[in-house]
Regions:
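Catalytic centers of hydrolytic enzymes
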Residues: 2-8, 12-27, 31-46, 159-174, ...
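Acidic, metal/ion-coordinating pockets
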Residues: 1-290, 329-341, 351, 504-506
Length: 555
């Protein structure tokens, strides 16, 4: 064997069903996709052969109609995600939170069909405390033992109902990584230890089972880990952490198969023939300009045809165009439609909803199944929770506090946003937590600070609104389980108390509910419910116009 050699590790994450170079939602060709990743992988395999490993960081089962079709419309066939990973010969994968969200029947079937090992060391059986998935995988490459330790973000109970993860307990990433690094170093005699995390760099929810995004914290505090491949937060980023006399790379290739991370392990052998890692070079590789793998496309041509036929089916029509961008500046048809559907289905008193995408447009005219993935991105269910008037008010206070600034002069920004080095403006916080309410009439005072902005005037029916009264409130399951912390940090409801507040859960996912509503009415007027506004308008209206031009520059 050579005294020095290189090993390549290619890493994808958060693919979200972007398997093919066609966007079934927008009904047009797209960049990225696993079809292009496949070309890149094949080219490097010709050079490196068995010295190349291909791994994935999870969230592969949700996002595009191809996933939905395979998961729920025709689950009798092997899952398309498993078929894609098997075709590309993936070596290891860590499971993601959106994989868990598909439901036990889907993800258990997937784990049984995919040929690579599926990891999550910090997900244990509640009764036995033994790992629910494999904690790690060992790959021997050119005489080198490489250990991959899988970690899943532990804050799943904040987003998903317990029926989706019943019998599982989620442990702190840092402590669990420390345990398994010691194990693979001592028991498995691993030469290289890699963290394969479905967890982002830092930030997010700080739960009672650890931080949502813990890659940097782990790199700083766990001795014996060589580098970390992370994901979940969709942030394209590479960082190097100095800890314990070592430099540890942490890399995230973002989402939707536009990038992958490529790590080159420079290895040497000691006098006894034992492999030793001398250095690592890590880079982010954009694959948007890679050629599409023709053999990949031939293999999956029948699947593509089936999914296009499903996604192109017309289910109704819109009387006007819907744009998510309008939702950030006041009442808008997009949010009003979702509120209408939620109130119609649940007969609740009040509805909460936020736009799930920054800027999508569904034009007036025919509505197809594919449009529903723009209307509603994920397979959330629809919940009804019992809340007091004061809790609703406090929830809205936190929602708008993440969304708007306190204006002190007419020249101030109204939107809570920041400018990037390239001059573009973006939200400072996650827009899918910008909840508005229907069923109540209220004002948002932009001149007042958090805690005193929301003035609820009445129920939209004309009846009085009371802080002490209890109301039935409709919301998606992400919010209803504590996602975005609007129920916990905002409304002040302890996480452990939330299940007792849930009055009903829809058996269908929200996209199915929306489809049934549109098919029933056929023509959707998409009117705007002007039940709330920013005040004082002398401050708010000019600022809204200015900030809208910054966030969405005229073309």
């Amino acid at each position: 064997m050579k005294p020095s050699f290189d090993i390549k590790i290619l890493h994808t994450t958060d693919v979200h069903g972007c398997f093919f170079p066609f966007d079934f939602i927008e009904r047009k060709p797209c960049s990225g996709s696993m079809a292009r990743v496949s070309s890149y992988v094949k080219r490097l395999r010709k050079k490196y052969g068995r010295r190349l490993l291909l791994v994935d960081g999870g969230d592969v089962l949700q996002g595009q109609p191809a996933c939905y079709y395979s998961n729920y419309v025709d689950p009798s066939l092997p899952n398309v995600a498993a078929e894609v990973l098997n075709y590309m010969r993936y070596d290891v994968q860590t499971i993601g939170n959106h994989d868990i969200e598909t439901g036990r029947a889907v993800y258990d079937k997937y784990v049984g069909e995919v040929h690579c090992e599926v990891l999550a060391a910090n997900v244990v059986d509640t009764a036995t405390l033994r790992p629910r998935f494999k904690p790690y995988a060992i790959r021997e490459v050119h005489g080198t033992r490489i250990a991959f330790i899988g970690m899943l973000t532990p804050t799943i109970p904040y987003w998903l109902h317990e029926t989706l993860w019943q019998g599982m307990t989620f442990l702190d990433i840092v402590a669990t990584t420390r345990k398994w690094v010691a194990h693979v170093r001592q028991t498995e005699q691993a030469d290289v230890v890699v963290g394969l995390f479905h967890s982002g760099f830092e930030g997010g929810i700080a739960g009672n089972t650890g931080n949502e995004n813990a890659a940097l914290e782990t790199a700083r505090s766990v001795v014996g880990i060589d580098f970390i491949l992370c994901g979940h937060d969709h942030r394209l980023r590479k960082a190097t952490v100095s800890a314990g006399g070592k430099h540890i790379d942490v890399v995230n290739p973002s989402s939707n198969a536009h990038y992958l991370s490529e790590s080159t392990l420079h290895m040497a052998r000691d006098a006894h023939g034992r492999s030793r890692l001398t250095s690592i070079d890590t880079q982010l590789v954009c694959i948007d300009n890679e050629p599409v793998d023709a053999d990949f496309m031939r293999r999956f041509a029948p699947t593509i045809t089936q999914v296009r036929r499903y996604a192109d089916r017309e289910i109704g029509s819109l009387a006007r165009t819907l744009r998510t961008r309008d939702c950030f500046f006041g009442p808008a048809p997009f949010n009003s439609l979702i509120h209408d559907i939620q109130l119609d289905y649940t007969k609740a008193d009040i509805s909460l909803n936020a736009p799930l995408k920054f800027d999508v447009c569904i034009p007036k005219g025919p509505v197809r199944v594919s449009d529903l993935f723009n209307l509603y991105t994920y397979e959330n269910q629809l919940y009804v929770l019992r809340m007091t008037g004061q809790e609703i008010r406090s929830l809205l206070e936190l929602s708008y506090d993440q969304w708007i600034a306190t204006m002190r002069s007419p020249r101030d920004h109204i939107m809570l946003m920041q400018q990037t080095p390239d001059g573009q403006w973006h939200w400072r916080n996650l827009a899918f937590n910008f909840d508005t309410a229907a069923g109540i009439d209220y004002e948002v005072n932009v001149a007042r600070p958090h805690g005193s902005r929301i003035n609820i005037l009445r129920l939209s029916s004309g009846r009085p609104f009371s802080d002490e009264a209890h109301y039935r409130v409709a919301m998606n399951s992400y919010r209803g389980n504590g996602g975005g912390e609007l129920l916990t940090r905002g409304a002040g409801i302890p996480l452990a108390e939330i299940p007792s507040r849930i009055e009903s859960i829809s058996p269908e996912d929200q996209r199915t509910i929306i489809m049934a509503y549109i098919e029933r009415l056929h023509t959707i007027p998409a009117t705007t419910h002007h039940n709330w506004r920013f005040v004082p308008e002398s401050l708010a209206l000019p600022a809204l116009a200015r900030d809208r031009r910054l966030l969405f520059p005229p073309s």
